[in-house]
Amino acid sequence: MKFLDSCILIDYINGRLPIDEDKSNLYINSIVENELIIGARDKKDLATINKKISLFPLLDIDQDIMDLSTKLLNRYKLSHNMSIYDAIIASSCMIYDLPLWTYNKKDFKFLDIGLV
């Protein structure tokens, strides 16, 4: 089981990264979903994005995740330039106890989460 960062899904959607694993064990949240949707260039692109990301279970972003993301931002925004998106993704990984599959390891290496 893993949490997928948007950078991994961008390569998957564009055909640069096959994902052969059981997609029911690869999770996203609405932050990742929105990061992908905002990158759509036209209606066809948007339809492709929505079709491909619908294969992955969507984890809820609850108050515990938002509270933890606020703590992470207070601690790491100035020292590591943490974004709100990365804070919510990291908090989701921590709360759901999932490693993060990302190319952007530098954005998360200072946190107590597994990186793939």
Give each language-model segment a name.
Residues I13, L58-K106:
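Active-site neighborhoods of divalent-metal-dependent phosphate/nucleic-acid chemistry enzymes
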Residues E35-I38, K44-L46, L73-N74, S83, ...:
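Residue-level signal for functionally critical sites in structured catalytic/ligand-binding pockets
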Residues K2, N25-Y27, L55-D60, P99:
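Short loop->beta-strand "edge-of-pocket" segments that line small-molecule binding or catalytic clefts
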Residues M1-V32, I37-K51:
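Short, well-structured N-terminal submotif of metal-dependent ribonuclease cores
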Residues D42-F56, D64, S69:
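Ligand-binding grooves and catalytic loops that recognize ribose/phosphate and carbohydrate rings
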Residues I113-L115:
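Ligand-binding "clamshell"
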Residues I37, I53, P57, K77:
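Conserved short-loop catalytic and cofactor-binding motifs
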